[in-house]
């Protein structure tokens, strides 16, 4: 039997050099590490890793080739109170594996035990890692490097975006390949999108609880192999990486960036009753935040929390991010529950991972977007991330909905959010683009559901409608659910138009949820993470072409307004913005706080957004000059040239002079 050579301690993972494969694994508390390789018949062969450099275990297997399936058995103490849960009866996934063979099914053998170890061997059913070799012709691919001030983000799910698209070949719908299909690229270009932000594509598992209910984790925020692509989105799992890179290359040729939603805050091992896949059995004490009683700090709501204050875990996370940039040419990341990245355990801007990203010549050059909170005390950190990061701006989301749907927000508060929330983000040299403005996202109501439902309807999730937020700031306009009279449909349409206009013509970086431009509904489900079905798949055959055209016109209008594209904070007298009342006069202090919801926003001295958010038709006197309504607002209801606008209830219009 071939013996392992000592090999070398870097890089982490399994790497083929043309003659064999070098294997490395971090574990600070292991006493022994076995590399387990499996032949074509499934027969297991075990090798002790002979090299031990600091906390890195390593070995080199001569004559090993790509396609080899492997895993690890890690020996060490079973001391739950101290956070140690080693169990060599369980085959473990390499945290840096780039391909996985097998499925993560709900099976008792994939659990290590809670108080006492489960010593039943699981190699026969455990997923295996696969050694891969990386050869890919990027041709002349180059990152679009779209300036932040010109960025329009489109948040989408790989499968849900194209699975029902009638113009995309059936055999590739819902896959990575479909993302790069000319039909999809042309659609994104016509819409005006500059960045496609994808929900997680790193391999994830469905929670055992969901599997028992016949459901699955659809969104993908339950990672199990952070370097491996989720195989279900590939036409062929063996070619997933090339399919993904083909799509990125095609999108780049069209000038569209690709941003990945990535989960560095927890793993699919969940709480101590959850499955054992990898980190818990490799070095539980190092990889996770452990309480004094040996249980996990659950700062994510998912059962465990990755310890990104540990230098080795920071190295792992940094290597993961570099992999996606260097190997797949992605243009940036959106970090789920990103406050975890800065925990020491207190949140700090100079936390190790933030510093590593800032000092990395690769990662410091890509777009970085934080979901700036977690569920721990002190977890709400909006505005507090390092300058390299942009952040999801929930202040904008809530303000836009409250202003147009609940009618309870003063003009001053609305204007503050419209102006990139400078009270939150104008610090440490940050620019307006640091505010990622959104009205909706994958998490919550769709835009159509915001105007059709007062209450969530999550019964299909199997939790008796307890899951999902109750703070939706939605308005069904008098009838719960879809459909209704022509008047009801028109009022809902007007509210959608108002929200889209606020999103796409405000200062900051706009993010549009895929399907909102269609009128997509999830029938009131505001937490559709486990709905891999027609509730979440975009139905292109039912898309509202009028709403899509309205959205595209807004995006193209945005690109004509210097005040929105120059990415500079608005200052008094700089000509970027003037805030006027219904008589075209500057608003008084009282009007800002207590005045009627009527406002004129003059941008770049040529573009005017006239707003009447009251219940009555109101005459709005425009500033001096010859004004004409412009697409998508020009039409029968808005005269071509006017000095006075008859503003309908809850209406708005954009003019140019």
UniProtKB/Swiss-Prot annotation:
* Known EC number: 3.2.1.196
Active site per the UniProt annotation: 336 (nucleophile), 371 (proton donor)
Give the top-rank taxon of the lineage listed in the UniProt record for this protein.
Bacteria
- Give me any GO biological process, just one: glycogen catabolic process
For molecular function, the Gene Ontology terms on record are: glycogen debranching enzyme activity; hydrolase activity, hydrolyzing O-glycosyl compounds
- Stretch list, region Disordered: 460-479
Which SMART domains does this one have?
A: Aamy
Top EC class for this record: hydrolase
Pfam families reported for this sequence = Alpha-amylase, CBM_48, GlgX_C
The catalytic activity, as recorded, is:
Hydrolysis of (1->6)-alpha-D-glucosidic linkages to branches with degrees of polymerization of three or four glucose residues in limit dextrin
Enumerate the residues marked as the site Transition state stabilizer.
443
Q: In which pathway does it act?
A: Glycan degradation; glycogen degradation
Keywords in alphabetical order, please: Carbohydrate metabolism, Glycogen metabolism, Glycosidase, Hydrolase
HAMAP family from the UniProt entry = GlgX
Sequence similarity: Belongs to the glycosyl hydrolase 13 family.
Q: What does this protein do?
A: Removes maltotriose and maltotetraose chains that are attached by 1,6-alpha-linkage to the limit dextrin main chain, generating a debranched limit dextrin.
The entry's protein name is: Glycogen debranching enzyme
Organism equals Escherichia coli (strain UTI89 / UPEC)
